[in-house]
């Protein structure tokens, strides 16, 4: 079945979650090879959940779910976070995007716990490796207590193949569990 023929509900949903300006929308653009999401240096550019159908190697027909930052503020920010929470309930894989130095990873840990409580696998993605050579990825890994943090640059495409491989591995594990039940 071609990706255009696969109903959206039957696709593998991959959610991108993180703080404002962590590069979620830029990652959507990098993964699709298209400018489908608006990006800027202004925090809070993504105001609504954006869905993008994509065919991923090793996964097949999928949907990328781009969300507003979970640290958004103010009255409108609260509404955007509510949409992000609703989107989180409908994903099959959560990518938690981080960048820069770990500045109190409480939000990231809380979101990871939320996903795990719902049996949703989590991949930590360190974005903007082009800005610091990835020197902070290990600090994030240790702070989060993660076995792995996939380092990427949405701007240059560095790490794209590793990210695709990591997502395909999670998909395979998820698919194996579904076949057993």
Which residue ranges define each predicted feature?
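A short hydrophobic beta-strand->loop->alpha-helix junction that borders the nucleotide-binding pocket
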Residues: 41-42, 67-68, 99-100, 152-155
């Amino acid at each position: 079945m071609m990706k255009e023929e696969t109903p959206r509900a039957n696709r593998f949903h991959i959610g991108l979650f993180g703080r404002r300006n962590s590069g979620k929308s830029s990652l959507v653009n990098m993964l699709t090879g298209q400018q489908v999401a608006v990006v800027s240096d202004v925090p809070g550019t993504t105001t609504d959940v954006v869905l993008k159908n994509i065919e991923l190697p090793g996964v097949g027909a999928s949907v990328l779910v781009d969300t507003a930052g979970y640290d958004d503020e103010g009255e409108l920010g609260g509404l955007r976070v509510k949409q992000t929470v609703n989107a989180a309930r409908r994903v099959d894989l959560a990518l938690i995007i981080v960048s820069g130095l770990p500045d109190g990873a409480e939000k990231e840990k809380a979101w990871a716990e939320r996903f795990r409580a719902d049996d949703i696998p989590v991949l930590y993605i360190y974005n903007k490796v082009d800005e610091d050579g990835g020197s902070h990825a290990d600090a994030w890994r240790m702070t989060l207590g993660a076995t792995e943090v996939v380092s990427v640059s949405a701007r240059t495409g560095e790490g794209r193949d590793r990210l695709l491989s990591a997502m395909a591995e999670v998909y395979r594990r998820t698919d194996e569990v579904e076949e057993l039940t």
